[in-house]
């Protein structure tokens, strides 16, 4: 940069007055402090002032930039001798509205006061510049306006609190669960919301019913069974009773008592009114295990004990043999009864008074009348139940 300035200064004539102290101010009046060492090195390498020894002495003594004290520039844009130091035309003068007619006519030739004036900004003013200002003193927005800016963006920035942006409709439903309603039963409260095939909301009960059965949940609840306390006014349509253990219905749907209902079910005809009883006949239900044990014990006892009452000596002998050798597997037990107890005490054996009567549990034996002892013995041998008695 400085080499270019040196070359151009050596080739062309100077466009400013090389009088001593033209580019310099006193140290007290200069608003910017420039180090002496840097200025001295720059002045020794670049010869801005030529042709007078006074100017050289000034550089060596003051070591400051000198500037013309005249308020007007040495050349302007209308000068017929433009500066040969730069290859571009000088900037046009800028009218800043001040009483002074001087301004920036070149990037190098400026007055001493105007050179540092932009550095000191007034209270209500702005920095001066030879270029077109790109920002106005009063900003209308916090950022420069672009091709896509509009007033909505600026109003958003000027607002103190940010605008809350609402989400999708699904988010609103999630935030407001009370706004949902079951399309089947109309319920608004449920532990879990479900959806049907079309996307409508269902409550948990309707959703599960539809999922398991493939049908919509019925809204009509099934009729509960009326408790017995509410059936006080009922009466049987057949016998007109009001007390029963179980209410039934006939083929016509009328309430009937348990007895009339069972009779109609078993016989197919209405129960006769003559069979009506004042009280309710109930049966005592016993455990099945106890009944079986009692029946088995009674059968065993009856098979071992055989009671016979003989009316003669011969029959008593045979009966004793039967008692001693009686088979326990026999199911029938013969019973011999006597019609004349006095004959047994006297020991008289009249043919008319000797009567043997055999009675079986199943009625296999009927009353048998034997007139003599030989017939009794023959009958005993023929019977199968006393076969071991004569062996």
Swiss-Prot record:
Chief site of localization: nucleus
Gene3D superfamilies: Erythroid Transcription Factor GATA-1, subunit A
UniProt xrefs under SMART domains: ZnF_GATA (SM00401)
Name of the protein in its database record: GATA-binding factor 6-B
PANTHER family: TRANSCRIPTION FACTOR GATA FAMILY MEMBER, TRANSCRIPTION FACTOR GATA-6
Region (Disordered) location: 57-107, 277-334
GO terms classed as biological process: canonical Wnt signaling pathway; cardiac muscle tissue development; cardiocyte differentiation; cell fate commitment; epithelial cell differentiation; negative regulation of transcription by RNA polymerase II; positive regulation of DNA-templated transcription; positive regulation of transcription by RNA polymerase II
Biased composition (Low complexity): 70-89, 292-319
Positions of GATA-type zinc fingers: 182-206, 236-260
Role summary: Transcriptional activator that binds 5'-GATA-3'-containing motifs within gene promoters. Regulates cardiac-specific transcription during embryogenesis and thereby cardiogenesis.
Skewed-composition ranges (Basic residues): 282-291
InterPro entries for the chain: GATA_N (IPR008013), TF_GATA_4/5/6 (IPR016375), Transcription_factor_GATA (IPR039355), Znf_GATA (IPR000679), Znf_NHR/GATA (IPR013088)
Pfam family, one: GATA
Gene Ontology MF: a single term: sequence-specific DNA binding
Tissues in which the protein is found: In embryos, expressed in the presumptive heart mesoderm. In adults, widely distributed but predominant in the heart.
Location in the cell: Nucleus
Keywords: Activator, DNA-binding, Metal-binding, Nucleus, Repeat, Transcription, Transcription regulation, Zinc, Zinc-finger
GO cellular component, one term: nucleus
Signal peptide: none
PROSITE patterns documented for this protein: GATA_ZN_FINGER_1, GATA_ZN_FINGER_2
């Amino acid at each position: 940069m400085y080499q270019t300035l040196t070359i151009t200064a050596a080739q062309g004539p100077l466009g400013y007055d090389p009088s001593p102290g033209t580019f310099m101010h006193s140290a007290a009046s200069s608003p910017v402090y420039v180090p002496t060492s840097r200025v001295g090195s720059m002045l020794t390498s670049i010869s801005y002032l030529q042709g007078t020894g006074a100017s050289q002495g000034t550089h060596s003594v003051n070591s400051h930039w000198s500037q013309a004290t005249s308020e007007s520039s040495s050349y302007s844009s209308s000068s017929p001798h433009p500066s040969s130091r730069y290859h571009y035309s000088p900037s046009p003068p800028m009218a800043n509205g001040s009483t002074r007619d001087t301004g920036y006519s070149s990037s190098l030739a400026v007055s001493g006061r105007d050179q540092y004036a932009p550095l000191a900004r007034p209270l209500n003013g702005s920095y001066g510049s030879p270029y077109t200002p790109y920002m106005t003193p009063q900003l209308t927005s916090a950022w420069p306006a672009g091709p896509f800016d509009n007033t909505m963006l600026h109003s958003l920035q000027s607002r103190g609190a940010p605008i809350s942006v609402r989400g999708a409709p699904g988010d609103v439903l999630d935030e407001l669960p009370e706004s949902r309603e079951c399309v089947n039963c109309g319920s608004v409260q449920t532990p879990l919301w479900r959806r049907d095939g079309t996307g409508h909301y269902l409550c948990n009960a309707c959703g599960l019913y539809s999922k398991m059965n493939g049908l919509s949940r019925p809204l009509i609840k099934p009729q509960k069974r009326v408790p017995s306390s509410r059936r006080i006014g009922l009466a049987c349509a057949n016998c007109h009773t009001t007390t029963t253990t179980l209410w039934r219905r006939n083929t016509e749907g009328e309430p009937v008592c348990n007895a009339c209902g069972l009779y109609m079910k078993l016989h197919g005809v209405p129960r006769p009114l003559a069979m009506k009883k004042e009280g309710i006949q109930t049966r005592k239900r016993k455990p099945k295990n106890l009944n079986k044990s009692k029946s088995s014990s009674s059968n065993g006892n009856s098979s071992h004990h055989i009671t016979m009452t003989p009316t003669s000596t011969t029959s008593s002998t045979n009966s004793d043999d039967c008692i001693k050798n009686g088979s326990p597997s026999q199911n029938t037990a013969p019973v011999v009864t006597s019609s004349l107890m006095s004959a047994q005490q006297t020991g008289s054996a009249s043919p008319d008074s000797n009567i043997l009567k055999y009675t079986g549990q199943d009625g296999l034996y009927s009353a048998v009348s034997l007139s003599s002892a030989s017939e009794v013995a023959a009958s005993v041998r023929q019977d199968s139940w006393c076969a071991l008695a004569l062996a």
